[in-house]
Design a protein with these regions (language model features):
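Membrane-interface alpha-helices at helix entry/exit sites of multi-pass transporters
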Residues: 19-27, 52-53, 148-159
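Membrane-embedded alpha-helical segments of transport systems
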Residues: 30-37, 63-64, 71, 161-168
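Juxtamembrane transmembrane-helix boundary motif
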Residues: 11-17, 21, 41-126, 147, ...
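Transmembrane helix-bundle signature of multi-pass membrane transporters/permeases
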Residues: 25-33, 155-163, 192, 219
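Hydrophobic alpha-helical segments embedded in the membrane of multi-pass proteins
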Residues: 115-123, 142-146, 159, 163-167
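Transmembrane helix boundary and interhelical junction motifs in multipass membrane proteins
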Residues: 2-11, 132-143
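Membrane-helix interface "capping/anchor" motifs
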Residues: 1-6, 45-50, 147-156
Length: 232
């Protein structure tokens, strides 16, 4: 619904069930492909996705995911958890208070600066996807708003980009993956249904403000639990 993908929630949830972190990241990427893919199909039918900016982002993200996947295998688990929890704190706070949104909303970049931002943005999305398994949507949405896109178009285009960024990152991780097939299938079905509901809510006239705040609180709670585990 918000175009950021669900992996930011999947990773801490799966890790909290006892799954190893890299396995949780790989599973989250697969779920991101399913959920963002199901939502992206609706966005494409409704012509809400701007392919002119989505395709370049996907291409550069595909390169970044290989770098991120390589770094994930070299980085100690505690460091990955720390980076992930910091990102969760930032995104959760932004969902609640929209402080950063006030900075980028109303600004618009065009010309050469736009091309440079797309290139850098694609790499960042890819690295985040490969390193943390988050899809990079939390970075894409504000970037597209800065490029002059409306909120709904930015969220829809971001959701489309997240599908392919997650796919590239999944391929970078899958060779080390040992999944619990039954658990993964159950979560895929639940996530697919949730994505369909969320995408339809976004296309309707229902405001996303309340949902943003609920998700923001959830992220802050999960980040606090991860940090508590690291400090204990």
């Amino acid at each position: 619904m918000l175009g950021i993908g669900g992996a930011i929630f999947y990773v801490p949830f799966l890790y909290g069930t006892g799954m190893e972190l890299l396995s949780a990241i790989t599973t989250a990427l697969l779920l991101n492909i399913v959920t963002s893919g199901s939502a992206a199909m609706l966005y494409l039918r409704k012509k809400m996705v701007d392919l002119q900016v989505a395709v370049p982002l996907i291409l550069f993200a595909a390169v970044g995911t290989q770098i991120g996947g390589y770094l994930a295998r070299l980085t100690p688990v505690n460091i990955l958890l720390l980076i992930f929890s910091i990102q969760m704190l930032f995104i959760g706070t932004e969902m609640l208070f929209a402080r950063f949104e006030k900075f980028y909303r109303g600004k618009e970049i065009s010309g050469k600066k736009k091309k440079i931002l797309i290139i850098i943005g694609g790499f960042v999305i890819g690295i985040l996807s490969g390193l943390l398994g988050v899809g990079g949507g939390s970075f894409v949405v504000p970037m597209l708003i800065v490029l002059g896109y409306g909120v709904k178009c930015a969220a829809a285009t971001s959701g489309f980009v997240v599908v392919f960024a997650s796919l590239a990152a999944f391929l970078a991780h899958v060779w080390t993956w040992e999944p619990d097939t039954t658990l993964v299938l159950y979560i895929i079905v639940a996530s697919f249904l949730g994505a369909q509901i969320g995408s339809r809510l976004m296309y309707s006239r229902i405001k996303a403000g309340t949902l943003r705040k609920i998700l923001g609180v959830m992220l802050l709670v999960m980040a606090a639990r991860i940090l508590q585990g690291l400090l204990s």
